[in-house]
Amino acid sequence: MKEGKTMDKTKIIYEKVMAFKQRFPGTVAWRLKAHCKVAADHINNDEEILYAFAAQKSYSMLNIVSTFVVVITDKRILLAQKRFFFGYFYYSITPDMFNDLTIKMGLIWGMAIIDTVKETVYLSNLSSGALQEIETVISKYMMQEKRQYEQEITPEERSKLQNELRNMSKHGE
């Protein structure tokens, strides 16, 4: 049964990433199905996939071979990459580890920088048009999740945010 659930998650993630790529075709990304499969393998059954996109996990705009799939669930942010020959890379950012988000825009591509307690994650080669959507999604998600850590939020508020992120993933802003 696990294989079927993983395939469903892979399909959901892949569809969200491809919708992102269609809205922002300038984003540089390769081997998306393989990366989506790695992400799906690490999503727990009680997590809901809210948003997904692809980017290069690198500080350098010249590095175009380090594609990662970034998935936002209702509990955390996941980054996954299937290595070319064997193995994979996987990172998880929980709301309590998140510090801040920085957006940098260049002439063609931009970068989203996620600062965590342990490290700084650079997501580069993003279409400059995608930066505002990514900033909105990550900021809204993290503010809501951090608020939940500090004080209890109502189920209605949580549901409203999740619906907003789902719709943004389907249609953009």
Regions found by a protein language model. Give the residues of each.
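The phosphoinositide-binding surface of pleckstrin homology
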Residues: 47-62, 82
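A generic structural signal for short beta-strands and their flanking turns/coil linkers
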Residues: 47, 73-75, 94
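Acidic, Ser/Thr- and proline-rich intrinsically disordered linker/docking segments
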Residues: 2-25, 31, 38-40, 62, ...
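Glycine/small-residue-rich phosphate/adenosyl-binding loop
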Residues: 44
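Short, compositionally biased strand/turn segments
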Residues: 64-84
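Short, flexible segments with low predicted structural confidence
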Residues: 49, 69-70, 105-106
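Small-side-chain structural scaffolding
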Residues: 52-55, 71-73, 110
